[in-house]
Amino acid sequence: MLQKEVLNSKALNFKGLNLKGIEDTVLATIINKKVYDVESLKPNGERSAPLVSLEKALSNQDGRNFILECKRSSPTLGDFCKDFDLDKILACYENKASAISVLCEEHFFKGSIEFLKYVKARTTLPVICKDFIICKAQIDNAYIAGADAILLMLSVLTKDTYKELLNYAHQKGLDVLTEVDTYEDAIFAKELNLKIVGINNRDLRTLKVDLNNARSLAKLFSKDTLVVSESGIHTHNDLLSLKGIRNFLIGSSLTGSEDIEFQANTMLYGTNKVCGITTKDALQAVINNHAALAGFIFCEKSPRNLSVDKAKELSALAHGKIKTVGVFVDESIEKMVAIANDVGLDFLQLHGNETVQTIETLHKLLPQVKIIKAFNIEGPKDFEKLHDYEALCEYFILDSKSPGSGTSFDWGKIPANINKDKILLSGGIGLDNVEKALEYEFIGLDLNSKLETVKGIKDANKINKIFNIIHNY
């Protein structure tokens, strides 16, 4: 954890710093280094990269807009990203982000302007230089490196210096993400009619996080201001809880994950699953819509039953893009293990009367595969069954008594105190009732037969439509 400092003499004499807001905080520790860094900064060269508008990227009204960050370390988490592979990070971000933020502060976040150059050369998205900017030379450096926008922090700068740097950046054609974290700074930003304002949920003086900061300060701005919630987003429900905010800056929660693709899909869009996939077209539509889980059914009674060969073909397409789930109903352990290994499944979904002992055995035989247990809900006592499996399962699914039939159980009977953090709601969810299903705030939905026009074959058009509703909820 970064320790707070008093400002050194060089910082105290540096023109334009918000001394009152910085003194004796962790911000002072960072600025004490930054004033020496900028002293030797001599920007040179010409910009070759085209300018891309951050404002335009965040003006998209279709769903949420994400500024996804390339971040390897922080004062609170230390070196949380051991494998800082920018190519892998960009491959994940490219079809999810509206813009990419690159940490350029070297000492405490271990960033670099070289990272920004690398990213800009490999994306058409707007790129933000995320640094503690205190002088024009840093703006020049960011501009030459290819930044399309910069971050200016009102917690760090005096109001006059902020306006000077804001105008200087705009003269170069750069957008500015202005960061506020107090009521006073938010009012100042509002009076300037700024186009883009970031509300930091982390108090950089204490490093404490409170999502209520964005909830309260966002209300001060008009609908014409592009408000961005920064910091503190760890789950999809965190996003949903910030009603009225459509733009989010997210970093360490993604790059610190062992599986950035799965983490991004679940956190940004929800832990949603489409079950009964039988064709490449359907699987591709599910991938394109950022579902987290693709279900392959291995049950001869189902019209969506897959052969092992077909499942292997689909699994190859899914690899690295979406997690695969093998769905079984009271199948033998031997057969489930064989199929899981042959197909390369990530999850087994048990949709019958499988016992705790069966799951314990599967864990021993398939340590790399996670377990989902589905329950067919008829009455209140069915919810009690979840407790026996709690420690053994990654997720639970609440389904109707006739899975795959397009019918729902009575969602009104779901206990108010049920733990929703590992449950997907299932059973007859389609375009007619998906918004109602989302109101129950489970981590995700399990979708199946209502996404079909022909029985057993998913309709890509219906998949697109239902996920559009989910992403705009």
Where are these regions (language model features)?
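An N-cap/entry alpha-helix motif that binds or orients negatively charged groups
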Residues: 3, 8-81
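Active-site mouth loops of central-metabolism enzymes
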Residues: 67-85, 126-133, 177-179, 229, ...
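Glycine/Thr-rich beta-alpha phosphate-binding loop at enzyme active sites
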Residues: 72-83, 88-109, 189-218, 293, ...
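N-terminal active-site wall of soluble small-molecule enzyme domains
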Residues: 76-170, 174-177, 185-189, 214-217, ...
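Catalytic cores of alpha/beta
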Residues: 134-146, 182-192, 229-250, 278-289, ...
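Glycine-rich phosphate-binding active-site loops on the catalytic face of alpha/beta enzymes
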Residues: 144-161, 198-208, 244-267, 291-303, ...
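Active-site/ligand-binding-proximal alpha/beta "capping" segment
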Residues: 194-273, 395-432, 443
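C-terminal helical cap(s) of enzyme catalytic domains, especially alpha/beta-barrels
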Residues: 211-221, 254-275, 308-318, 361, ...
